A protein has these predicted regions:
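Helix C-cap/helix->beta junction micro-motif
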Residues: 7, 36, 68-69, 184, ...
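Substrate-binding/gating loop at the entrance of the active-site cleft, primarily
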Residues: 1-11, 18
Length: 293
């Protein structure tokens, strides 16, 4: 959005809601395209999604609309390897001629901040690829050598077992969080991939002079619980919606991967041992939420 605004291009949010699992409604997309036929359009689709943790389940319908209105789609698949189902889902399966796939190593490798990635263009968009390559060469020439060497290993070696363990562990801790928060009336959708969950506190928090926005809520949780999350307003949601995004990544990845090196079933009783900070934080949050009602 900032880049588009810099070029004086209009940015339109196609709003989603919890009732439809935070998915883009194909009918809403079609309505917008129909009302703005004269403008060239780019659809940015992120799945598995940040901040919701959900995966889009109507890709074929979205692809049909994209084809009808000749959209260029940027399919942000940075979390694709962390889809808990282990199945690769992409809009490019249904609309390859107009879909640009973006990805990288920072998420599935657990290498936050190590920004090395790829963009895959179809032949039909070769001219656009050439233009972007030219702009990129004038913006950044390369990434640092350590990241390049890490990427060589990441892309040249099979990581099936590692990815399986990553998906399993994230699915387990996300289910624990979902069940705990839901038990006290905090509304959320069970994550399907990645490591985020979007939570609606509106039914457990009485809006007061100190909590009127999602930013107020996050500040209060940080001050009283040392619990950090981001306000929904950072992701385009209305300021007065008491919605926050949580990330469930504060654990010892090496220990968890070692635990999953054997095929013994992971039991819920093991969560405090392998995810102690998340376990303690969620338990404190649940207790705090009860006190606010």
């Amino acid at each position: 959005a900032p880049q588009a605004k810099f070029l004086s291009k209009r940015v339109e949010w196609i709003m989603c809601n919890m009732k439809n699992n935070w998915h883009i409604d194909p009918e809403e997309l079609a309505k917008f395209c129909s009302e703005n036929k004269s403008e060239p359009k780019i659809l940015i689709l992120n799945s598995p999604n940040n901040p919701t943790g959900t995966t889009h389940n109507r890709l074929e319908d979205l692809a049909s609309i994209a084809k009808d209105y000749n959209l260029i789609v940027i399919s942000d698949e940075i979390y694709a390897e962390l889809d808990f189902s282990g199945t690769y889902k992409s809009l490019s399966h249904y609309y390859p001629q107009g879909t640009i796939i973006s990805g990288g190593i920072s998420k599935w490798c657990g290498a936050g901040g190590w920004r090395l990635g790829t963009m895959v263009f179809p032949e039909e968009l070769n001219d656009l690829r050439t233009a972007i390559r030219s702009v990129s060469s004038e913006t950044f020439t390369s990434v640092s050598a350590p990241i390049q060497y890490a990427a060589i290993n990441a892309y040249n070696t099979s990581h099936d077992r590692y990815l399986w363990a990553s998906r399993e562990s994230l699915a387990i801790i996300s289910e624990f969080i979902f069940e705990e928060l839901s038990s006290v009336g905090i509304e959320c959708i069970k994550p399907e991939g990645g490591f985020y969950i979007l939570c609606d506190f509106s039914k457990v928090i009485n809006k007061s002079s100190s909590i009127r926005t999602s930013k107020d809520l996050c500040k209060k949780m940080l001050a009283e619980l040392n619990f950090a999350n981001l306000p929904g307003s950072d992701f385009g949601l209305p300021d007065d919606d008491l919605i926050t995004r949580m990330a469930f990544v504060d654990f010892d990845g090496s220990a968890v991967l070692k635990r999953f090196s054997n095929d013994k079933k992971f039991e819920k009783e093991e969560i405090p041992m392998f995810f102690p900070k998340i376990y303690e934080g969620i338990k404190k949050l649940v207790k705090w939420a009860k006190e606010q009602s």
